[in-house]
Structure formats: C-alpha cells, structure tokens
Amino acid sequence: MTLPIVAIIGRPNVGKSTLVNRLAGDQQAIVHDEPGITRDRTYRPAFWQDRDFQVVDTGGLVFDDDTEFLPLIREQAMTALAEAHAAIFVVDGQTGPTPADEEIANWLRSQSVPIILAVNKCESVEQGLIQASEFWQLGLGEPYPISSIHGSGTGELLDKLIIYLPTTESLSETNEIKVAIVGRPNVGKSSLLNALTGENRAIVSPISGTTRDAIDMVVQRNEQQYRLIDTAGIRRKKNVEYGAEFFSINRAFKAIRRADVVLFVIDALDGITDQDLKLAGRISDEGRATVLVINKWDAVDKDSYTIYEYQKMLESRLYFMDWAEMIFVSALTGKRVEKILDLVDNATASHRRRVSTAVINEVLQEATTWHSPPTTRQGKQGKIYYGTQIKSEPPTITLFVNDPKRFNDNYRRYIERQFRQQLGFTGTPIRLIWRGKSTREVERTTNRATRV
C-alpha cells in the first residue's frame, strides 16, 4: 500500500535521524557525529495506534550557506515537505531557539502542511517543560518536549501526529517490487534513479560518496508499484574508513538482502573490475534476481560489433551470473532506461515462480534420457529419483538421489541449464539441493512425488 508520508525537518544536528530511528523502531538512518551526515531524503516505515506511515529523514536545513551540498539538501528537504501529509519540525532544547530555527519556522508557516514542533534533547520531564516553553516564540503552536534517545515524550508527539494521517483501512494494497540499485562509486546509480523516476530524487554530484544512506523512492507504472532503493557506492574494504561510509556500505548490503531485484550498475568505460566481481558474488550469494545495467554506453566509442564483444566479455567475466539479463543504457541521456523495468518485471516473475513436482520430474526424465548421470571409477552410477521445489525467491529445488557424491560439477550444471531452458528461469539464480535417499525411502514417498 502507499503509506502517508511524514517529513522530519530541522537544522543540522538537532537529532532528526535519531528521531527517525526511534519512530521506525530500527537503526537504519545513519547517526554519526559528523555535520550534514544525512544528505538525501530517506523513507522508513513506522506505526502508531491504527496508523501505518512513512517517516522521511532529510538533511539539515540551512538557508544561509552556499557550500556545494547544502543547496542540494535544501531542495531535497523542500521536496519531502511537498509530498508529506504532515511534518515534524525538530529543534534542540539544550541550545534553545536559534536564528536558524526562526528562519526555518518562518518558511514553514507559509506551507500548507500541518507542522508539529518537537523539542528534542529534553532528558528530564521537569526541565523539558521549561526548555520547550522557550519555543512558543516560533509561532508554530504547542512545543512537544521529547528525548529521541530515550523515547520520552514521543507518545504524546505521535498522538498529535496521527490526527493528520489516514487509517490503514483506507489505504489500498499494492503488489510492490523492491529494486536495489547497486554498484561501485560513481557508476551512475543516482543518475539512473533520477532517470527512472523522472525527478532529481537523489543528489547527483561528481564527488565520490554523495549517496550515503540506502534511499527509497516509490514509482508507479501501469498497475505495478516499484520501490527503488539507491545505495552508497561499494568500495574495497581497505579503502573504507570507519565512520559514515562504513555504515553506508553495510546498509547497501542490507538493501541487497531486502530487494526482490538488484540493478547491478556497471560503468561501460571501466568494464568489469575486481570489485565488480566481488560485488556480483555477494549479490549471487544472497540469491537476488538481477539485471545487469551497463551505464554510460553513450560515452563508448563503438561500431556494429562493439556490443557483441562487450556481451562476450561480460559473460566471460561474470560466468557465475550468466543467468542475469543485461541492458546497455545511458542514465545521462535516458536512452533505453525505460526498458529496465520490463526486465525487472521478467526477473521478478522468475524469482517468485513455483513449478509443480510433476513438471520438474518431466524435465528430469528428459534430461537424464539425453545425458545419463555419471558413473564412478568403481562402476557405480548416480541415479536421480525425483525432484520437488521447496521454496521460491530464489527458486530452490531439492533433488533426491542415491548418492550426491556421484554427481560431479559438470553434471550438476547440466541439470541446472535444463531447468533454466525448459522452465524459463531467466534473471534469477536457482538453487539445487542434492540429497541422498535410499531406494527404500524413495518407495515410501512414491505416493507424494512422481519418480524418475
């Protein structure tokens, strides 16, 4: 369902990300003692009483600084407010009202969105009431003293907030596809997100490491909803300092795990690097459906054979991910970007697909007829009794055999290829579990599965 949005607004370092973590009940927003740590607007699901909603974590709002990132952060905060049902304006109770708070308050009073004033860092009830009273002067109504770290006062804040939010029953269900956009730094992930959504949703800058959080954007195409997750660029461990980037990379790995499909973005000018190979291995290990997005194709000098040569190189270097579909695009010009979601749809369908035991065993029957299982040096031949799919996402098939050790890697790859070719598992990894089973055990289960 499309959840109502609550924007968290405030100047830098008043505890906005800590409040988001408190409301969302997790530690996803990066909290670290470095100014301006939240750059993009990031969405987190939250719940209170009978209301489901999203809290939007924005960068620290500053109106009088022209350094490179701050104007971009202002734009992101303003966009978050424009799409919100309500906003929480966070101030620092320990410092009292500042000129920056007054400037933000003046701007907020001109907006049509309901504003709730949260006075953070009020660590005691008595002192908090005194601290909060100083903020009446901002002209935004009653100040609510809270402690984001300890949670005190947040219940009263949320009671006020949900007055402005629709109930869960009034929200329509959607079959959402979660898509993580993953790759090395500066391969064009944020530009791709912007091209897919048609707005400057993620900050695009030539500075490496612009995207620090895994940030979400929900887009609709026809009847299908997609949650696009832009992630921080993933570098070699030895190049990552402990701090915000360290946390961001861990967040990117979590984004891979929660995604239905990964858009693995590769720089066409760099080709496949060692770091790309390691990242591809991580995606494959997590069992995620994948689309290989070769970006910056507009910058490549090419002739009529270039794309075929590049495809061969990709298939050679990423041989363990040969099941992934690939597309050559330019996020900068938008060329072929609109076709990416078609591949996402195909990969999702394969990733979620379930096949009956009867069909699986028909494939096995034909496969073993054309190519018999191997025989050991001692003359003992492998035998596949039957197979059954035990789960999807990714599709996982258990094969019951007389002895798993009798099936070498070549034959296992052959069986996997047969499943892919005959059952259409494109864009997703599949898992085959080879399980030993005696003839007597097979006979006891013959009423539950078709034997081969």
From Swiss-Prot:
Residues binding GTP 2, per UniProt: 183-190, 230-234, 295-298
Subunit field text: Associates with the 50S ribosomal subunit.
Cited function: GTPase that plays an essential role in the late steps of ribosome biogenesis.
Source organism, top-level taxon: Bacteria
Keywords per UniProt: GTP-binding, Nucleotide-binding, Repeat, Ribosome biogenesis
Gene that produces this protein: der
SMART domains associated with the record: AAA
Domain EngA-type G residue range list: 4-169, 177-352
Single GO biological process annotation from the record: ribosome biogenesis
GTP-binding keyword on record: yes
NCBIfam families noted in UniProt: GTPase_EngA (TIGR03594), small_GTP (TIGR00231)
Domain KH-like: 353-438
Annotated binding of GTP 1, by residue: 10-17, 57-61, 120-123
Sample GO molecular function, one term: GTP binding
UniProt cross-references to InterPro entries, sorted A to Z: AAA+_ATPase, G_ENGA, GTP-bd, GTPase_Der, KH_dom-like, KH_dom-like_a/b, P-loop_NTPase, Small_GTP-bd
Organism, scientific name: Gloeothece citriformis (strain PCC 7424) (Cyanothece sp. (strain PCC 7424))
Protein name: GTPase Der
Entries under PANTHER family matching the protein: GTPASE DER
Pfam families: KH_dom-like, MMR_HSR1
Homology family: Belongs to the TRAFAC class TrmE-Era-EngA-EngB-Septin-like GTPase superfamily. EngA (Der) GTPase family.
